[in-house]
Amino acid sequence: MVMCTLCKREEAVFMRRYSGEKLCGKCFSKSIENKVRGTISKYEMLQPKDKIMVAVSGGKDSVTLLHILTKIEKAYPGTALSAVTVDEGIKGYRDEALKVAKKNCQKLGVKHVVTSFKEMYGYKLDEIVNMIREKEL
C-alpha cells in the first residue's frame, strides 16, 4: 500500500506526475483548494463586498469549484456568491445536471439562477439547429 506523501497516514489515491506526490483523498482535495486560493490571491481576483457568480453546469468540475468558492468566500467579508446554470434546450441533455446543480446550491445556501437559450434568444438550441438544417436543405 502506497501512503500519502503529505499526511503519511492515509493510503494514496492520486499521483501527481509533475511533482511525484502521492496523495490521499483529503490531501488531494485540500491541495486543489489551496491552488484556487493561491490563484485568487496572486491575481487579486476577490475583494470584500464583491459579487461572485459562478457558472454551474451540474458536472463534477463546476460543482467542485462551487464548493471551493463557498469555503473561500468566507475569507472575504460582504461578498455574495451566486450560481447560474444555462439550459441550452437540448432534449434530455441538461435534466439530470440541473438537478445536481440545484441540489448542491441548496445544500451550500447559494442563490441559484437558471436561465435558458429560450429565455435569452427566443429559441432552444434544438430549434436553432433545426432552423439551420432546414436552410441548408
Residue ranges and their predicted role:
Residues 1:
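Nucleotide/phosphate-binding catalytic cleft detector across ATP-hydrolyzing
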